[in-house]
Amino acid sequence: MAKRDYYEVLGVERGSSEADLKKAYRRLAMKHHPDRNPDDKASEELFKEANEAYEVLSDASKRAAYDQYGHAGVDPSMGGGGGFGGGAGGANFSDIFGDVFSDFFGGGRAGGGGGRGGAQRGSDLRYTLELNLEEAVRGTNVNIRVPTLVNCKPCDGSGAKKGSSPVTCPTCGGIGQVRMQQGFFSVQQTCPRCHGHGKIISDPCDSCHGEGRVEESKTLSVKVPPGVDTGDRIRLSGEGEAGTQGGPTGDLYVVINVREHAIFQRDGKHLFCEVPISFTDAALGGELEVPTLDGRVKLKIPEGTQTGKQFRLRGKGVAPVRGGGAGDLMCRVAVETPVNLSKRQRELLEEFRTSLENDESHSPKASGWFEGVKRFFGDL
């Protein structure tokens, strides 16, 4: 099968710059690399094709020969340039595109810091703190126990036995990176001996085995301000994992999770609750006590109250953590139908029902609904 035009393979114009070629190649290689597409022969062939095209077009002399003579100008069997060394196994995926991924993800683990080698910031930690609604609304002080990594005391975080110190890595010369030739690529990789630190420990500390850090659980006091809600974060600066090679300590983020309440539901600064009332109180009106976070308050129920009616108790909600006035407590009435009636109670209700017959003024919604039903069926 005839080879495709190399510019077509990369999806660029013939006059494209070296930067455009590189950008197009990386996009294709990231998409079709075998590490991303295992057992996908089609992607493997596209990756090889992109490698071949980029090797030629990224080399000024090969590109000139290709532009003048086409594939014949770079085909060794026809007296052209050298062969292709990339192939599907050419360069390591993570090494070729490490700088691309650094742009996407900021490099390394979330909360880490610094470049390769040398001092690196410790990772940030996350701790989920469960609170009940009252604690979240009023604020509280809580002691938490957090597992973390701290500097090893015997070696003071160096990883080397007392009396010794880390030495410059002979493999990378202290840079933390080595340059390797893989196919037609020359790529920079993390030094396999010092793992990017630039130094090695020839006599490791017995306590941390050369790591410079050890696991430890810390007890911390967390001051929770009033008004927090699920998802709010409290940052404890410097309470994360210890850094390496003398790097700064990370932070601890305490993430709030407020448990469900038996009575109240929260929406921002407002609270909601359902208040059951008897149908006699709903019909005749009355006064009842309802709970709030500050204690019980009296709520006046007017006569003729229907299920779903909502009453607002101003200022009985939550004062937001970021300031502002307290929200309201919204009490939604739910009229209960009586059950387990005595004989006398049933008789009274029967009398009451009889007294309502043919008098629609007592149930305006019901009468209106029935009228609507009649019109509906009359239109069919």
Curated annotation (Swiss-Prot):
<dbReference type="GO" id="GO:0005737">
    <property type="term" value="C:cytoplasm"/>
</dbReference>
<feature type="repeat" description="CXXCXGXG motif">
    <location>
        <begin position="169"/>
        <end position="176"/>
    </location>
</feature>
<feature type="binding site">
    <location>
        <position position="155"/>
    </location>
    <ligand>
        <name>Zn(2+) 1</name>
    </ligand>
</feature>
<feature type="repeat" description="CXXCXGXG motif">
    <location>
        <begin position="191"/>
        <end position="198"/>
    </location>
</feature>
<feature type="binding site">
    <location>
        <position position="152"/>
    </location>
    <ligand>
        <name>Zn(2+) 1</name>
    </ligand>
</feature>
<feature type="binding site">
    <location>
        <position position="208"/>
    </location>
    <ligand>
        <name>Zn(2+) 1</name>
    </ligand>
</feature>
<keyword id="KW-0479">Metal-binding</keyword>
<keyword id="KW-0963">Cytoplasm</keyword>
<dbReference type="InterPro" id="IPR001623">
    <property type="entry name" value="DnaJ_domain"/>
</dbReference>
<dbReference type="InterPro" id="IPR036869">
    <property type="entry name" value="J_dom_sf"/>
</dbReference>
<feature type="binding site">
    <location>
        <position position="205"/>
    </location>
    <ligand>
        <name>Zn(2+) 1</name>
    </ligand>
</feature>
<dbReference type="GO" id="GO:0006260">
    <property type="term" value="P:DNA replication"/>
</dbReference>
<feature type="binding site">
    <location>
        <position position="172"/>
    </location>
    <ligand>
        <name>Zn(2+) 2</name>
    </ligand>
</feature>
<feature type="binding site">
    <location>
        <position position="169"/>
    </location>
    <ligand>
        <name>Zn(2+) 2</name>
    </ligand>
</feature>
<keyword id="KW-0143">Chaperone</keyword>
<feature type="binding site">
    <location>
        <position position="191"/>
    </location>
    <ligand>
        <name>Zn(2+) 2</name>
    </ligand>
</feature>
<feature type="repeat" description="CXXCXGXG motif">
    <location>
        <begin position="152"/>
        <end position="159"/>
    </location>
</feature>
<feature type="zinc finger region" description="CR-type">
    <location>
        <begin position="139"/>
        <end position="217"/>
    </location>
</feature>
<keyword id="KW-0862">Zinc</keyword>
<dbReference type="GO" id="GO:0005524">
    <property type="term" value="F:ATP binding"/>
</dbReference>
<comment type="similarity">
    <text>Belongs to the DnaJ family.</text>
</comment>
<feature type="region of interest" description="Disordered">
    <location>
        <begin position="224"/>
        <end position="245"/>
    </location>
</feature>
<dbReference type="InterPro" id="IPR012724">
    <property type="entry name" value="DnaJ"/>
</dbReference>
<keyword id="KW-0346">Stress response</keyword>
<dbReference type="Pfam" id="PF01556">
    <property type="entry name" value="DnaJ_C"/>
</dbReference>
<comment type="subunit">
    <text>Homodimer.</text>
</comment>
<keyword id="KW-0235">DNA replication</keyword>
<dbReference type="GO" id="GO:0051082">
    <property type="term" value="F:unfolded protein binding"/>
</dbReference>
<dbReference type="InterPro" id="IPR008971">
    <property type="entry name" value="HSP40/DnaJ_pept-bd"/>
</dbReference>
<feature type="domain" description="J">
    <location>
        <begin position="5"/>
        <end position="70"/>
    </location>
</feature>
<dbReference type="Pfam" id="PF00226">
    <property type="entry name" value="DnaJ"/>
</dbReference>
<dbReference type="InterPro" id="IPR036410">
    <property type="entry name" value="HSP_DnaJ_Cys-rich_dom_sf"/>
</dbReference>
<feature type="repeat" description="CXXCXGXG motif">
    <location>
        <begin position="205"/>
        <end position="212"/>
    </location>
</feature>
<dbReference type="GO" id="GO:0008270">
    <property type="term" value="F:zinc ion binding"/>
</dbReference>
<dbReference type="Pfam" id="PF00684">
    <property type="entry name" value="DnaJ_CXXCXGXG"/>
</dbReference>
<dbReference type="GO" id="GO:0009408">
    <property type="term" value="P:response to heat"/>
</dbReference>
<keyword id="KW-0677">Repeat</keyword>
<dbReference type="InterPro" id="IPR001305">
    <property type="entry name" value="HSP_DnaJ_Cys-rich_dom"/>
</dbReference>
<feature type="binding site">
    <location>
        <position position="194"/>
    </location>
    <ligand>
        <name>Zn(2+) 2</name>
    </ligand>
</feature>
<comment type="function">
    <text>Participates actively in the response to hyperosmotic and heat shock by preventing the aggregation of stress-denatured proteins and by disaggregating proteins, also in an autonomous, DnaK-independent fashion. Unfolded proteins bind initially to DnaJ; upon interaction with the DnaJ-bound protein, DnaK hydrolyzes its bound ATP, resulting in the formation of a stable complex. GrpE releases ADP from DnaK; ATP binding to DnaK triggers the release of the substrate protein, thus completing the reaction cycle.</text>
</comment>
<dbReference type="InterPro" id="IPR002939">
    <property type="entry name" value="DnaJ_C"/>
</dbReference>
<dbReference type="GO" id="GO:0051085">
    <property type="term" value="P:chaperone cofactor-dependent protein refolding"/>
</dbReference>
